[in-house]
């Protein structure tokens, strides 16, 4: 071993010291860059037996060919080529080399091939083919070279320059002319005469990569196809055979040729010949079926398009081919393995999509989708009756597959709603009758907290009647529904649906003669119909309303809900809630059976935590959907929930707090929307709120929160936040404002206020009592937001006391933001009525905002702190905007706040117009809107004219209206910037209206000349600033003027606008006098 070999070994030896390794790396690197490196490495390649040394030498060749090939002389290039071919002939083929060496040699030769083939080495393939021998590694190396040519020349997986793409195309064309026939012949010889599975697999890999761009007849013929079929029966090579068929079918060609090719291949017979004894192989075969079927569908669609354009029909057997693939589709789609089923899902989906475009389905097509519905049902069935929190990979894959199957089912439903409705009705009837028969001797389930009143019990004996009603309603669907795609096939649809057999029942575990998965999937498909119905006609929707209503009644009165299977319970409640609104108004007595299932041990008292939680959540949704229909049952619901409403850790071990919130919200909506007699409403509210209010008052009065520590997990403080939450959440059902017109309700209808006022008295104390707890403050704001709607005008007198308390405790930016949201809500709701409250509080609030913004250390870019500061700036400007929008602009001009207006507000608005950085556009837009409102309000003739405002207009506002859009940061292609420019146009027009000739003279003689604007354009400005001109014309002129100044192309069809394109377009906005300079952050330190 010489120094060279040692150096290479040292480079890869982890046990060598770092010093020696660095010396070795330096030595080998010097060899790589030497001018004669190729010659040195060629000599060493023929002498060494060390794999690392061989690899190094080949790597040197690769780098030279890639990066320094043009530096070699013609003689050096020829010697390099000859040397590599000699090494192949004398050494490589006669020794058992590592795969890494074989692959690296193939890569090097292909790089050399790309450089030399077209001009100097047209015999490349002849040279290698002449050296192929069955007794050595030559065939192996040649196949690797062919594969590497695909990677370097053909494959589109790598980004290539246009020049390289052109060269590669030329190489392929030359290969087609001179070499491909010989290469294909060599593949055939290998497949016929060699029994080595690795060689056969490599040959098949070559074929599948080349078949896409060579003459297809070279492969699809009587020589190759029988060989493929032969090897399809050989387990170790059949995967590659299957992939070859896929690539053959995937080859781009016109639709007639594609169908002829598929017919010639006889895929159906090939697949029937294969031994489908392995799941992985079945997936490959399924992928072949999937691709073949999709290609047939696409080809038939293309042929149909050509026919419409006047082409004669040239191919009659396409439908026969499609039928063959569909039969294979049904077979593989219904396979026990979901992976096999999914391999043909694309074909099933595409076929159904194609059927959606057919107006009238034939009998065969109806049979197809009927069978698909049954297969979808079979494949959707759960293997386990529980949903685990930590799903394994197989569970996640099944959930994803189920989503795809659901989408397929909904599309089938949209094609033939009456057939699917009949199929679902048959399934529901079967599972209901089965469960009812098995449970007829069992006692009806009782509520965990007692029997629900007689209103609910009256309907227990109606199961059989409503089961019989399913068929009646299904018949109504068939009689009344007009199928969007097929008006004449209802009878056939129903007949086919009723004839479907379950193909997989033998694998199920029985549960009282009925698998839980059968029950669950039948209800689940009924649920999915609601997703699909939205895309059908209004007539179809109406015809199904009665059907859905009857399904709800039957399910709720059946024994299905009495189950220990989690997945059945969950889909049962989901489906009930989805369709409960379709229970006919004259059959509302059945709602009692619906409610009963929610309120007893099937629902909110279920032993399964997930079912309990879901039932509570869905009961809340049901209360919002059907609050009017549920009014008669309020007392029963309260009784069923009474233990669940207690706020205590013991109860929350069984009923988490989030679920308790759902119950409070449900009851709030029911009671608040019931229009109950005053005494009855008060009784119900007392039942629900008395305990939380008393508990809150007790904790405050006894100062129990002071004993909280980490050890007791802040027991009482947490309880206080929960109590605020439940009272506030319950209040969502109550409002002092009429929902239809927004007017205040008479006091006689708002007697509930006493309970919320009483709660407010306690809650407003908490920020002062527990000032360090941010959750308490946050929940207090939540409650205050609710009180704006709940108390209405009764809240206003309390705000004088409440607002200072809340502001005092807004010590962090997050809480200050919450305060501003609440403050803006008050302004929006009460408007000018709130003047006496806003006027004294405005200055302290603005001061608090400025102090929070004046951070000594700027926040880290893109951090939460920066986000919070940006949000605070936005909230500040939204506050100023709200004052103008809701007739409270006079608060800024009051004696108390006028200094604030001049010293801070004006300057911050100007700064906001010049804002830069992230999200600055939104701040700029708001600030220009504010400027326009200031001009309207504070200029002469405005409702709140301000002395000295004129100087502000001329010194700052007008220059700003040109400076901002002319700045480099202003992007004319941005939508928000366009909106800002429109606002600027409005402001300038408003100034012209308020200040008249004085302003027009200023523009004519001072501002526009400073911008080097021609007199012609100045005249257009003056003309379009007149109130008599359309404002849109002025906004268009301004936009085009700014574009011209920025050197952007301008174009307008407006005849009133004519900009002189020879005008100086240099950006002279620096000439504009800007006395309102800020630091670009919108709101400046100290308000300047």
Swiss-Prot record:
Residues 435-513, 1059-1088 are annotated as: Disordered. One of its GO terms (biological process) is tRNA export from nucleus. One of its GO terms (molecular function) is tRNA binding. SUPFAM superfamilies: ARM repeat. It is found in: Nucleus; Cytoplasm. Residues 435-503 have a biased composition (Low complexity). InterPro entries: ARM-like, ARM-type_fold, Exportin-1/Importin-b-like, Exportin-T_C, XPOT. GO terms for cellular component: cytoplasm; cytosol; nuclear envelope; nuclear matrix; nuclear pore; nucleus. Keywords: Cytoplasm, Nucleus, RNA-binding, Transport, tRNA-binding. Its main location: nucleus. The keyword Iron does not apply. The keyword Plastid does not apply. Belongs to the exportin family. Mediates the nuclear export of aminoacylated tRNAs. This is Exportin-T. The gene is xpot.
């Amino acid at each position: 071993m010489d120094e060279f070999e040692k150096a290479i070994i040292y480079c890869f030896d982890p046990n060598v010291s770092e010093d020696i390794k660095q010396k070795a790396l330096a030595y080998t690197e010097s060899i790589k860059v030497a001018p004669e490196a190729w010659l040195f490495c060629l000599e060493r390649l023929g002498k060494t037996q060390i794999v690392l040394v061989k690899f190094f030498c080949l790597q040197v060749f690769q780098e030279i060919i890639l990066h320094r090939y043009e530096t070699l002389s013609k003689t050096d290039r020829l010697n390099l080529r000859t040397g590599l071919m000699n090494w192949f002939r004398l050494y490589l083929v006669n020794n058992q080399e590592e795969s890494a060496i074989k692959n690296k040699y193939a890569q090097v030769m292909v790089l050399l091939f790309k450089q030399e083939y077209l001009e100097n080495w047209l015999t490349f393939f002849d040279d290698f083919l002449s050296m192929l021998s069955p007794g050595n590694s030559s065939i192996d190396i040649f196949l690797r070279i062919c594969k590497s040519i695909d990677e370097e020349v053909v494959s589109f997986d790598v980004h290539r320059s246009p020049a390289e793409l052109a060269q590669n195309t030329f190489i392929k064309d030359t290969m087609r002319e001179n070499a491909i026939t010989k290469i294909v012949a060599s593949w055939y010889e290998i497949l016929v005469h060699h029994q080595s599975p690795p060689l056969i697999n490599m040959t098949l890999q070559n074929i599948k990569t080349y078949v896409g761009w060579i003459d297809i007849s070279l492969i699809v013929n009587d020589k190759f196809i029988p060989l493929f079929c032969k090897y399809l029966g050989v387990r170790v090579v059949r995967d590659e055979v299957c992939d070859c068929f896929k690539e053959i079918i995937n080859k781009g060609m016109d639709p007639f040729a594609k169908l002829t090719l598929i017919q010639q291949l006889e895929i159906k017979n090939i697949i029937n010949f294969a031994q489908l004894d392995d799941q992985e192989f079945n997936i490959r075969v399924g992928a072949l079926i999937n691709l073949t079927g999709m290609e047939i569908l696409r080809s038939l669609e293309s042929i149909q398009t050509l026919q419409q354009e006047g082409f004669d029909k040239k191919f009659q057997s396409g439908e026969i081919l499609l039928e063959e693939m569909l039969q294979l589709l049904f077979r593989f789609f219904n396979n026990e393995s979901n992976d096999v089923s999914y391999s043909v899902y694309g074909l099933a989906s595409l076929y159904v999509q194609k059927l959606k475009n057919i107006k009238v389905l034939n009998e065969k097509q109806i049979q197809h989708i009927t069978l698909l519905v049954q297969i979808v049902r079979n494949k959707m069935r759960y293997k386990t009756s529980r949903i685990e929190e930590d799903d394994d990979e197989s569970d996640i894959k099944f959930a994803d597959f189920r989503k795809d199957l659901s989408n397929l089912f909904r599309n089938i439903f949209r094609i033939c709603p009456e057939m699917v409705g009949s199929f679902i009705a048959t399934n529901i009837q079967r599972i209901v009758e089965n469960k009812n028969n098995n449970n007829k001797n069992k006692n009806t389930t009782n509520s965990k907290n007692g029997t629900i009143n007689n209103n609910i019990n009256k309907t227990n004996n109606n199961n059989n009647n409503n089961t019989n009603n399913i068929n009646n309603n299904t018949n109504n669907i068939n009689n009344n529904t007009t199928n969007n795609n097929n008006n004449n096939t209802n009878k056939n649809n129903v007949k086919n649906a009723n004839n479907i057999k379950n193909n997989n029942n033998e694998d199920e575990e029985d549960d009282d003669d009925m698998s839980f998965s059968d029950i669950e999937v039948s209800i689940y498909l009924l649920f999915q119909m609601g997703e699909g119905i939205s895309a059908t006609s209004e007539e179809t929707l109406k015809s199904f309303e009665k059907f859905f209503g009857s399904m709800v009644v039957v399910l709720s009165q059946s024994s299905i809900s009495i189950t220990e299977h989690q997945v059945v319970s969950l889909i049962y409640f989901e489906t009930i809630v989805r369709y409960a609104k379709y229970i006919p108004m004259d059959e509302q007595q059945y709602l009692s059976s619906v409610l009963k299932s929610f309120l007893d041990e099937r629902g909110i008292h279920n032993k399964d935590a997930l079912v309990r939680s879901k039932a509570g959540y869905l009961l809340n949704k049901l209360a919002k959907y059907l609050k009017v229909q549920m009014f008669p049952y309020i007392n029963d619901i309260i009784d069923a929930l009474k233990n669940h409403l207690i706020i205590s850790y013991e109860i929350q071990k069984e009923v988490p707090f989030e679920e308790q919130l759902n119950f409070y919200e449900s009851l709030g909506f029911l009671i608040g929307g019931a229009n109950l007699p005053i005494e009855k409403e008060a009784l119900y509210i007392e039942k629900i709120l008395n305990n939380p209010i008393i508990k809150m008052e007790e904790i405050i009065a006894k100062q129990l929160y002071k004993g909280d520590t980490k050890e007791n997990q802040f027991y009482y403080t947490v309880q206080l936040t929960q109590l605020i939450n439940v009272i506030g959440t319950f209040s969502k059902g109550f409002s002092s404002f009429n929902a239809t017109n927004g007017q205040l309700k008479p006091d006689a209808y708002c007697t509930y206020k006493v309970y919320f006022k009483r709660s407010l008295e306690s809650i407003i104390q908490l920020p002062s009592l527990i000032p360090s707890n941010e959750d308490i403050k946050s929940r207090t704001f939540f409650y205050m937001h609710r009180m704006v709607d709940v108390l209405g005008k009764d809240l206003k007198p309390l705000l004088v006391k409440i607002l200072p308390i809340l502001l005092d405790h807004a010590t962090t930016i997050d809480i200050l933001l919450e305060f501003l949201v609440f403050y803006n809500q008050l302004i929006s709701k009460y408007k000018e009525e709130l003047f006496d409250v806003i006027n004294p509080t405005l200055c302290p609030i603005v001061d608090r905002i400025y102090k929070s913004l004046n951070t000594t250390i700027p926040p880290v870019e893109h951090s939460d702190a920066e986000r919070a500061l940006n949000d605070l700036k936005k909230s500040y400007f939204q506050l100023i905007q709200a004052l103008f929008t809701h007739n409270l602009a006079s608060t800024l001009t009051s004696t108390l706040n006028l200094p604030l207006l001049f010293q801070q507000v004006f300057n911050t608005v100007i700064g906001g117009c010049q804002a830069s950085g992230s999200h600055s556009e939104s701040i700029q837009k708001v600030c220009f809107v504010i400027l326009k409102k200031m001009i309207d309000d504070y200029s002469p003739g405005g409702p709140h004219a301000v002395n000295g405002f004129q100087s502000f207009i001329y010194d700052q506002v007008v220059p700003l209206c040109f400076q901002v859009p002319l700045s480099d940061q202003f992007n004319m292609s941005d939508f928000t910037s366009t909106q800002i420019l429109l606002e600027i146009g409005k402001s300038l027009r408003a100034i012209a209206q308020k200040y008249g000739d004085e302003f027009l003279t200023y523009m004519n003689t001072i501002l526009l000349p400073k911008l080097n604007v021609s007199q012609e354009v100045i005249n257009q400005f003056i003309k379009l600033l007149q109130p008599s001109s359309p404002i849109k014309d002025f906004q268009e002129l301004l936009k085009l003027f700014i574009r011209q100044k920025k050197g952007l192309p301008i174009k307008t069809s407006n005849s009133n606008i004519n900009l002189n394109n020879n005008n100086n377009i240099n950006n002279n906005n620096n000439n504009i006098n800007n006395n309102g300079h800020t630091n670009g952050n919108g709101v400046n330190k100290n308000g300047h």
